[in-house]
Structure formats: C-alpha cells, structure tokens
Amino acid sequence: MATRPGPLTEWPWHRLGNFKYVVMAPVVAHGARRVMRNGWGDLDIAFSLILPSLLLRMIHNQIWISLSRYQTARSKHRIVDRGIEFDQVDRERGWDDQILFNGLVFYAGYLAMPSVRRMPVWRTDGAVVTALVHTGPVEFLYYWFHRALHHHFLYSRYHSHHHASIVTEPITSVIHPFAEHVVYFILFAIPILSTIYLGNVSAMGIVGYIAYIDFMNNMGHCNFELVPEWIFQIFPPLKYLIYTPSFHSLHHTQFRTNYSLFMPFYDYIYNTMDKSSDELYESSLKGTEETPDLVHLTHMTNLQSAYHLRIGIASIASKPYSDSAWYMWTLWPLAWLSMVLAWIYGSSAFVVERIKLNKMKMQTWAIPRYNFQYGLTWEREPINDLIEKAILDADMKGVKVISLGLLNQAKQLNGNGELFRQKYPKLGVRIVDGSGLATAVVLKSIPSDAKKVFLRTGTSKIARAIAIALCDRGVQVIMNEKEVYHMLKSQIPENRASYLKLSSDNVPQLWIVHNIDDNEQKMAPKGTIFIPISQFPLKKLRKDCTYMSTPAMRIPEEMKNIHSCENWLPRRVMSAWHIAGILHALEGWNMHECGDEMMDIEKSWSAAIRHGFLPLTKA
C-alpha cells in the first residue's frame, strides 16, 4: 500500500480474495454457450486465445519467480545483497491481478471490435509496426509518466507502493495500484490498436507483444545479472535498446535515476542514467563467490510440498504447510510430474534458501526425494549417496557445519549420520543431527510442576535422553512398551530407576510421543497434552486435547531473508534440528553430533537463548 493511498488504489475484486478468478466467469460462459450451440468450430482464434494466454502468462511469471529465487540463493551474480521479508511477499501476492484485468479488457475489446475476430495467426508487417510504435511513443510516454509518478504528490499516493520493495523479485514488476495499471494498459494498447487500425493485427503479434512485456518486466526485477557482456560487444547500440537487471535495480535503490521502461535510450537523452550503471553491471556479472558457514539438509515431504519450498509458489511458501487447502488439489498433476522428474533426474541436492544472521551465512539444500521414498528399502542406498554427496560438496566448499533435517538423519537410513562420520573420519565439516537441542526444547515445554508423564516414543536417542532427564528430575515416567521399557531401565541410574514405570493404567494427561496411530490417540484421556519429539507433526484427531508444536523455537530479529515457512511451522519459527546446526557454527563447536553422540542438553539450550532464539511455549 502507498504511504498515502489515493483513489483507485485497490483492485475492484480485492474483497473476493482467492475467489477473484470468478471475474472471468463471463468469458467462460460465453465460450461454453457458443460451443453448446454451434460446436468447437464456432470459436475463432481471437476468442480461443483469451483464457489460454492468461494461463501461459501465469506459468511464465511463475517460472521467473522460481528461477530468481533459486539464483539469488546460490548465484554469485546477485545484485542487491539484502533480504526479503514476509511483508513483501504479502504485498506482492496479488501479482496475477493485472493478468485478470488484461483478460477482462481483451474480452471487452473482442466484443467491441468485431474486426479482430477475423485476424490471422501472424502478420510480419504488424509485428514491425508493433516494434516501432513501442520503441517510439510507448517508451517515450512511459518515461515521462514514470518521472511524474516520482513527484511527491503521485509518489506518496500511488508509486510508493511499488518502491516499497527495494530488493526486487520478478513479480515486483507488476505490483502497482490499480490506477497505475489502467495507465500502463492504455500505453501498451497503443501498438495493438495501431495494428488494428492499419489492418495488420495478428493473434501471435498480440500474444508475442504481451509475452515480451512480461519477459522484460520479469528480467528487470529478477535481482541477478544474466545479460551476457558479449551481446553488447557484438552490437554496441543494443545497450540503448535493452536494459539489464542491474540497470533497473539502481532505480529501486537510488529512486531518481534509470526511469526507462525497457530501453535506456531515454535516460541517456534526458541525462537521468545512473552514473554507476555500467560499474554495477560489470561487478554483478563478475560476481563474488561466497561460502556458507552452515548448510541445512532437508527434503520434500509429500507430493504437494514442492510448491511449499521457497523456490516454489511464493504465497504458499510464506504460510505453514497444509495439504487441506482446496486449491492445492488442482496442482496434483504438476506435483506428480515434478516427483517423477526429481526421481529420474535428481542427482544432487539443490539450494532452496539463503539466510543471514549478522555475519553468518547459511543455506538450505534439498535432497530431491520425498517422504515415501525414504521408506523404500531399495531407495536407501541411492538416498544415502545423495546425502553423502551433499556432505562432501559442503566439505569441499569449506562449510563449517551441515545439519541433517527430517529423514536425512533417520536411524534406519544412516544411523543418525554416523554412517558418514565412520566412512570419512577426516571430514572438516561437522555433521549435526540436532538431538541435543531437540531434547532440550521438549524438556523445557514440560510444565515444571508435572509429576507424571506418559512416554510413547520408541528407542531413539532423544527418547532415551528425555526419559533419563525426567527421572533425574523426579518425574514419574510411565510406559506401556515392554521392550522399550527394559531397554531404558538399563540406562537409568539405580537411584532413579524407580521413577520409570511399566503400566497401562492411570495414564496421565501429559503425553510425550513420537509417532502414534489414531487408536492410541483415542485411548488418551480427555484434556491430554501431546508433546511430540518427532520432526513431523501429529495428526490432530482429538478436539478435546492439546497438540504442541514439534520441537522448534522462534528465531531472532537479526536473522534476515526469512520469507518462507519451514514446512508446517509458523512464520519466523525454525525447527530445533535446524537451529542446532546454527548454534554449532556460531559457537565453533568441534564435535560431530551424530550416531550416539549428543550435545549437552543445557549447553545447547543456553546457547540458543544467548543467541536470541526463544521458546514457543513457557513451561
């Protein structure tokens, strides 16, 4: 929103929210009526292209979003090295509004101008006219309109909304108040109306021109330099006809320079080109290699989780993951396709996120596999190979710590990472499974006045540590798993072993659990508090019970470039396993935390609090 919003700031369908696509219902109804009356042959090319062209534009923009986020996380060609936060993602989530607006206006034009219904697929002379009119009137008028928008009166009421994003993403290009988009559409309609008037309009000419506008808009705001220098060396005048991402980035950081639409020609003429444009272009193209201090290794969970990655769909990634959202079901075909492609071609981990905490740099890498694949016996070796390759890559780059998230540290897969430590005893990178901090978070979430807890956690080292700590605290730990009970009993000091009890009666209302099925949840007494020790949340089956979060903490304000949620966790909340790796790097701890090794629980907790991480709940 602009600093002082003026008239026509909001889109007409703003209050419809996610149901805004209903505004295209007249177009769908029109097409359906014609098909039912006269068959598919009654649809001319002009009408047939309206809806498909809108869909293609959305796909085009999404490709740019994913590409930009991937490149800015890993590439040395990043232009503005600052973070993006959730407020920017929320502000820019309506990037498809202008596509719907264009669709409605094109439909209105189709109804108002019968001559366009007979236009051919392609006219070369029409394409030439479009190019000439854009280069002349459109670029000229846009330049001066843009300069007018930077006058205080219009800037504070309209254009400041766009400039709220100093670090740009491709979709920043279309984040403007509705009134601005009306003017932009009029400008971009000039070449199209010119070809209609001259009689050389064509379907592909219109679609191609809109695609050109989208491409240049997205490229100019992608925040990484990709235009090769050899293009300008072969044809030097091109620097006046095509801007670069670094050229337009200066407009967002300096505000009073580089006003041109796509062609810097007018900035050269009117002396508004930023003097550092060439220098920034060259430095961005050259780039600077950087090595993260920490790499957190994650993976996709279910099929739809690919959209929840930071490089997926921005608005979905900015919210805690939920597979119950109705619109997610429409993406199932693409989800299946992405899974198959990842399974076949996913030969290494890929970068999905880049985070900074003061001077420390962190990256998140994803193994291109899904939850169900980790449970397949024949997939264990290939998955371990992928994890091993990621560890060795991190080691070769000089990364200090690599933390294993989700199932990448599964005991049945690699013994909580012990497999890699044994295989490569001279590793420079420290392998961290985060068990010490995860244990601390669980223990700190248990009320201090608790006298009894029910433990249903299996035999993991986190479960052992929790049982030992609770018995040492004088808390009665009740279990109903005989084999697990005897295993834990042997590891608890004799003077505290009496606090561990095998019983199925008088189960308390405080349950510490790993993975329990529906039947076990139904057995819990009313008012039970479930505290999970797993990285995966429990299914919330009971409305009369309380479900605590998986072990996690709130991150400090100093942590930047956080604009996506970690799986199902709320905004600016991070799993204990991820935080453990950060602490390992910050503190310079030299030990591996994998296999049976575990960081001291109190030491991990104290370090987390000292560095600004906060508990989600107070015991």
Swiss-Prot record:
Domain Fatty acid hydroxylase: residue ranges: 138-272
Keywords: Endoplasmic reticulum, Lyase, Membrane, NADP, Transmembrane, Transmembrane helix
Residues that span the membrane, as ranges: 45-65, 94-114, 126-146, 178-198, 325-345
Xref: Pfam families: CER1-like_C, FA_hydroxylase
Molecular function as annotated in GO: aldehyde oxygenase (deformylating) activity; iron ion binding; oxidoreductase activity
Record's GO cellular component terms: endoplasmic reticulum membrane
UniProt subcellular location: Endoplasmic reticulum membrane
Major location category of this protein: endoplasmic reticulum
A Gene Ontology biological process term: response to abscisic acid
Family: Belongs to the sterol desaturase family.
Subunit structure: Homodimer.
General function of this protein: Aldehyde decarbonylase involved in the conversion of aldehydes to alkanes. Core component of a very-long-chain alkane synthesis complex.
Protein name according to UniProt: Very-long-chain aldehyde decarbonylase GL1-4
Organism name: Oryza sativa subsp. indica (Rice)
Gene for this chain: GL1-4
